[in-house]
């Protein structure tokens, strides 16, 4: 494709993805960088927008460029940029907060109410040839870390953030409900942080098999457990811990039965982190939360240092993200990539769309 073109993968409306030309962005802020996008992962949120046009309060009202799990190469820098140079390969943190909100100043910029997050309406995403980013939301990819691995840094950063929230350390016994990309990476980070037991729970055997590449010490298939069988599910998981409860439980599925079972699986004084986004409302045993004096923590994306730490985990070999990638598509086949993800949800873990040539 021409250097003078800027093709973008655009969600025109629900169920309609097209490649269209967008203006090549120009640097107006001296701290910004122009990037050539090289690889982008498909996230579940992209699929939600494609199928239903919205997630919670974020509703698609106009065509929007998709994608937020990306890596790229620096092709131009603003006059004040000092952190990167032309030619650097980088992972791109896709959410830029207000520099002035209380949340940002308090150190939790991921909670900033004015966050501009890629591919969250009305903000355009990263599935485009050229993209602008502030320099301080880029992390250099060390030699030996591929663009494909760089695109996986975004979901890996969620795993880093959730493990920090939970305080996972050497000897921690962990259970992960949901073996999708975020669940797998959350478990892998737990092992990297020193967890001695990491049990994955999911309804798909192929995903549980893949969990062995992400630090699983054991797995449990939960497909036979309906919403009213949460205690039975928890009992089955606890058998794999020698009948004991877990120190830390990460709920990464958002499924009602798993949320209930996660509470029941957490030990007295233990910690449960709700990572998965499920329904707006769910039923769970709140009396048990109080009676155990357990910590129930919400987790939203990632914050300061998480992207940097995620890149370091990949670069040092402590987390291998390569087994996460199950499918790859050319840029011009992006619509096919999304349709394939929907049609083969139980088979697909992470799909990478390469940048335009």
UniProtKB/Swiss-Prot annotation:
Zinc as a keyword of this entry, yes or no, is yes
Main EC class of this protein? oxidoreductase
Q: Which residues bind Zn(2+)?
A: 43, 68-69
- Which residues of the sequence carry a binding annotation for substrate? 49, 154, 301-302
Report the record's Gene Ontology biological process terms: hexose metabolic process; sorbitol catabolic process
**InterPro entries in the record:** ADH-like_C (IPR013149), ADH-like_N (IPR013154), ADH_Zn_CS (IPR002328), GroES-like_sf (IPR011032), NAD(P)-bd_dom_sf (IPR036291), PKS_ER (IPR020843), SDH-like (IPR045306)
Keywords (A to Z) from UniProt: Metal-binding, NAD, Oxidoreductase, Zinc
- Catalysed reaction equations from the record: keto-D-fructose + NADH + H(+) = D-sorbitol + NAD(+); xylitol + NAD(+) = D-xylulose + NADH + H(+)
Q: Which cofactor does it need?
A: Zn(2+)
Report whether Amino-acid biosynthesis shows up as a keyword of the record: no
Q: Output the Pfam families linked to this UniProt entry.
A: ADH_N, ADH_zinc_N
Q: Name one GO molecular function term.
A: L-iditol 2-dehydrogenase (NAD+) activity
The residues the record assigns to binding NAD(+) are 202, 207, 275-277, 299-301
What family classification does the UniProt entry report for this protein? Belongs to the zinc-containing alcohol dehydrogenase family.
Q: How does it assemble?
A: Homotetramer.
Task: Explain the purpose of this protein.
Answer: Polyol dehydrogenase that catalyzes the reversible NAD(+)-dependent oxidation of various sugar alcohols. Is active with D-sorbitol (D-glucitol) and xylitol as substrates, leading to the C2-oxidized product D-fructose and D-xylulose, respectively.
What is the protein's name according to its record?
Answer: Sorbitol dehydrogenase 2
Q: Which gene encodes it?
A: SOR2
């Amino acid at each position: 494709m021409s250097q003078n073109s800027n093709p973008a993968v655009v969600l025109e409306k629900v169920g309609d993805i097209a490649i269209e030309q967008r203006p090549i962005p120009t640097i107006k802020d001296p701290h910004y960088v122009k990037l050539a996008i090289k690889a982008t992962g498909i996230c579940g949120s992209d699929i939600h927008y494609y199928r239903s046009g919205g997630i919670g309060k974020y509703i698609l009202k106009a065509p929007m460029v998709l994608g937020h799990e990306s890596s790229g190469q620096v092709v131009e820098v603003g006059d004040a940029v000092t952190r990167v140079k032309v030619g650097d390969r980088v992972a791109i943190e896709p959410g830029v907060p207000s520099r002035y909100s209380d949340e940002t100043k308090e150190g939790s910029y991921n909670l900033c109410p004015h966050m501009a997050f890629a591919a969250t309406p009305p903000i355009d995403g990263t599935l485009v040839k050229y993209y602008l980013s502030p320099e301080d939301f880029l992390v250099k990819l060390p030699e030996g870390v591929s663009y494909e691995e760089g695109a996986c840094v975004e979901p890996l950063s969620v795993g880093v953030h959730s493990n920090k929230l939970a305080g996972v350390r050497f000897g921690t016994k962990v259970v992960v409900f949901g073996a999708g990309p975020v669940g797998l990476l959350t478990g892998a980070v737990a092992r990297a942080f020193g967890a001695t037991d990491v049990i994955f729970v999911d309804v798909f055997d192929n995903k549980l098999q893949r969990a062995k590449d992400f630090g699983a010490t054991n797995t449990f298939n939960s497909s036979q457990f309906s919403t009213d069988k949460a205690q039975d599910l928890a009992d089955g998981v606890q058998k794999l811990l020698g009948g004991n409860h877990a120190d830390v439980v990460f709920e990464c599925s958002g499924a009602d039965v798993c949320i209930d079972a996660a509470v029941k699986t957490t030990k007295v004084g233990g910690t449960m982190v709700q990572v998965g986004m499920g329904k707006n409302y769910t039923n769970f045993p709140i009396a048990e939360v109080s009676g155990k004096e357990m910590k129930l923590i919400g987790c939203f994306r990632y914050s300061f240092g998480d992207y940097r730490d995620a890149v370091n985990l990949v670069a040092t070999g402590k987390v291998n993200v390569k087994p996460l990638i199950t499918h790859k598509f050319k840029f011009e086949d992006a619509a096919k990539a999304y349709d394939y993800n929907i049609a083969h949800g139980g088979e697909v873990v992470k799909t990478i769309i390469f940048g335009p040539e």
